[in-house]
């Protein structure tokens, strides 16, 4: 009986650790999806910019709290894109779009990998829960037999 209690404690601890890991992976997955959506929006904006025939089109520049300033795009043939670690480079619109498409593929791979890891964790969580249930049933059967 004491051995069953120790095993249940061990399983409960493992369950909590796995749940915490799954929660972290789920948060990472959410962040990856948000970042991917942002990159998709930028890519779509650049693709739409290519379709505009005006040389210096007017735009609204967000300044925060739902407020905007009117502005003009001075150079609609080039964009400055972040390349990571706080660095940005100027690229032609087509090069910027190509760069963003590569980044989207990287996000897709990271999302797929994270989803796989999360599925494995959830599978392991289910196994631990089933094992704990078996131990509890065994324990209750043993205590039932003893009480007879």
Curated annotation (Swiss-Prot):
One of its GO terms (biological process) is protein folding. It comes from the Archaea. It is found in: Cytoplasm. Gene3D superfamilies: 1.10.287.370. GO terms for cellular component: cytoplasm; prefoldin complex. GO terms for molecular function: unfolded protein binding. The keyword Cytoplasm applies. NCBIfam families: prefoldin subunit alpha. Belongs to the prefoldin subunit alpha family. HAMAP family: PfdA. Molecular chaperone capable of stabilizing a range of proteins. Seems to fulfill an ATP-independent, HSP70-like function in archaeal de novo protein folding. This is Prefoldin subunit alpha. It comes from Pyrococcus horikoshii (strain ATCC 700860 / DSM 12428 / JCM 9974 / NBRC 100139 / OT-3). The gene is pfdA.
